[in-house]
Regions:
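Short, well-ordered amphipathic alpha-helical segments that serve as non-catalytic structural scaffolds
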Residues: 41, 77-80
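Divalent-metal coordination cores built from histidine and acidic residues
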Residues: 79-195
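Di-metal (Zn2+ and/or Mg2+/Mn2+) metal-binding site signature of metallo-dependent hydrolases
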Residues: 55-78
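Histidine-rich, glycine-flanked metal-binding segment
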Residues: 2-58
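Redox-cofactor binding/interface segments in oxidoreductases and associated redox assembly factors
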Residues: 51, 63, 69, 91, ...
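Conserved protein kinase catalytic core
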Residues: 19, 59, 69-71, 97, ...
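Divalent metal-coordination and catalytic microenvironments
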Residues: 14, 27, 32, 54, ...
Length: 198
């Protein structure tokens, strides 16, 4: 592997936190990626140096389960995340309450809402509602960058939430073909409804 002879930034003097240890080290950054971690004298020269003396240095943190519908919007959520040291949020994408908004339409609307107000990076995780228009627009939503989805075999009393086996299998095939991931709540909606009514 080639070693960079020059990087954009070096963060020095702090305690670097990795997944396995905390150590005195410097971090070399090129573009938006960590190029090297180690003693400063072994790192390439940089255009900019940041003094982290007395501080902990961590890579950007990711919150992969965020709800930003209701009181919080994307701008406020991003501001709170940045203050907390998060650099990426993966909120649940939501559908318009009126009409039959497709998954593609929801993705485009949310991309517009995030727009330039975002101080952090965003990814999205969508619940695949039990509506033909959602499944039909799934491949296009994946082409637009959404790769994480959730489905439910329960919540029978919530419109469009509970999915039958055929719908789930079709969605799983489509998500796999597009290189995505799908989380499934596997409780039995019929048994839960029976127990709720008992």
């Amino acid at each position: 592997m080639a070693v960079d002879t020059h990087v954009d930034t070096i963060v020095r003097g702090g305690k670097v936190v990795t997944s396995s240890q905390v150590m005195d080290a410097a971090v070399a950054i090129k573009g938006e990626k960590i190029a090297a971690v180690g003693p400063e004298h072994l790192l390439p020269k940089a255009d900019r140096y940041i003094d982290a003396e007395g501080k902990f240095v961590l890579p950007g943190l990711i919150d992969s389960h965020v709800h930003l519908d209701g009181h919080d919007d994307y701008a406020l959520g991003a501001l709170a995340a940045a203050h907390a040291g998060l650099t990426t949020l993966v909120p649940f994408g939501n559908y318009a309450l009126e009409g039959d908004e497709t998954l593609e339409q929801a993705v485009r609307r949310i991309q517009d809402e995030v727009g330039t107000a975002a101080l952090v990076d965003f990814g999205f995780h969508f619940i695949l509602q039990n509506r033909p228009s959602i499944l039909a627009s799934l491949p296009r939503a994946m082409e637009l960058g959404v790769k994480s989805f959730k489905m439910f075999m329960t919540y029978k009393k919530r419109p469009g939430r509970m999915c039958d086996d055929d719908y789930i299998c079709n969605a799983m095939d489509m998500v796999a073909k597009g290189g995505g991931v799908l989380q499934l709540h596997c409780e039995s909606g019929n048994i839960i409804e029976y127990l709720e009514n008992k």
